[in-house]
Amino acid sequence: MKKNLVITAAVGLKVEQLTLFIKSLRKYYQNDVCFVIGEADHELEKELIRNQIFIIKTKISKKAIQFKRYEIFLNFLKNKKYENILCCDSRDIYFQSDPFNFNYKGKINFFLEDKKIKDCPFNKNWIIKTYGEKQYEEINEKIILCSGTVMGSQSKIIEYFTLIINNISKFKYKRKLKYSLTFRIDPEGRGCDQGHANYIVHKKLIKNINLYKNSSGPFATVFYLKNIYFNKKNELLNSSNDPYILVHQYDKRWDEFKSNVNEIRKKIGIDRIL
């Protein structure tokens, strides 16, 4: 039987921040899951063991894991054989169905947001400060893709991780002077792995891809999602009235999601209401 994998990082996070991710995923999917956690995340470790989840412990800090996770993921995949892999964020995602029960069009699949790069100050900043104005101008009309959800075959995911790792090493985020002088991470650059992902995809450095629209695709990245519709089961629907497979960044639209998320939490056995 061919196996699939969900792989994510959750260094320094609390159990309650991840309960919705874990329980909603395990409601629909019983195959392999791997979490990267910190060495001091003891309560989280217990919860992951209870849910039969692989654990990788790291000394890397919560602030640095955003970049370093790709190397850890790549190392984990050595000598492993999976059919498809979902690499995703953890804290701000919940699932509405099995992420692998869908006929994805690409060997590797990326999921768009609802804004152009030039219209988002965060994505604009990440690309300018890693690749420069000239490269930014070449892709600034492209729609943002979210690096927090990537689905593909093992070989393409490995290729993608390798490209990300190489570009993180080659194109350093230009920190503000006060952070450079004190050898600290610039907080504005912590999400710029997404800048690398957008550069790699929109410059066509990886082939056999498919880009799914946010409104009609299988994954919802809701920060810039234009229309929010729920059915009577509290499921978020796309423009075809199909439930999204997963919902990402729901906390950024919390007023619109609170009642539905709390109903979902009750249904999957989470007592604590937010």
Language-model regions, residue ranges each:
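Catalytic core and acceptor-binding pocket of nucleotide-sugar-dependent glycosyltransferases
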Residues: 139-258
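Juxtamembrane luminal stem/stalk of type II transmembrane Golgi/ER carbohydrate-processing enzymes
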Residues: 1-5, 266-274
